[in-house]
């Protein structure tokens, strides 16, 4: 779906704005990926989620501790959490992504949010293995992320 189709789908099926909170968490200082998906201007001709009429987007930036990320998710009543991770030496990104899932489970929040990770070497398979609902790598845009998130929200409601 493109930006306008996403907004129409949300209006028809969810009937309120979808709240998305995104960040590069842990020690990751890179924001190119999360900014490409979240920011108003977007990337490569694709607008970011901040421009979507029916999405309330909160980009927390980089180096956000997982605990703070969860705190903000609760504060904003997030429907969707987006985590951007650059692949690191010693697989710190894997530890960080795993820790976030564990913290969400401990808080009883894991099943209440759509959890998505992305980055230059993140695959959908790796994301699923780590306990995420989806993973997006290079060549993906806000349209792709939004389409997955909102269709997953609707699927979960029907269960």
Label every model-predicted segment:
Residues 19-21:
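Conserved beta-strand elements of the Class I
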Residues 143-159:
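A charged, well-structured terminal subsegment
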Residues 26-29:
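Short, surface-exposed ligand-recognition loops at beta-strand->loop->(often short) alpha-helix junctions
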Residues 1-16:
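Short N-terminal or domain-adjacent regulatory/targeting segments
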Residues 31-38, 43, 47-132, 139-147:
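Cofactor-cradling patches in redox/metallo enzymes
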């Amino acid at each position: 779906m493109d930006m306008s189709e996403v907004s129409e789908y949300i209006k028809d099926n969810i009937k309120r704005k979808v709240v998305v909170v995104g960040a590069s968490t842990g020690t990751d200082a890179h924001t190119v990926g999360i900014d490409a998906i979240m920011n108003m201007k977007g990337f490569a001709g694709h607008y970011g989620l901040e421009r979507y009429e029916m999405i309330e987007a909160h980009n927390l930036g980089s180096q956000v501790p997982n605990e703070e990320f969860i705190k903000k998710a609760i504060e904003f009543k997030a429907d969707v959490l987006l985590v951007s991770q650059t692949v690191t030496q010693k697989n710190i990104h894997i530890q960080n992504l795993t820790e976030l899932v564990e913290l969400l489970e401990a808080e009883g929040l894991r099943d209440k949010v759509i959890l998505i990770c992305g980055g230059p070497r993140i695959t959908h398979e790796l994301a699923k293995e780590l306990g995420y609902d989806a993973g997006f790598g290079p060549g993906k845009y806000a349209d792709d992320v939004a389409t997955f998130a909102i269709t997953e929200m609707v699927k979960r409601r029907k269960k």
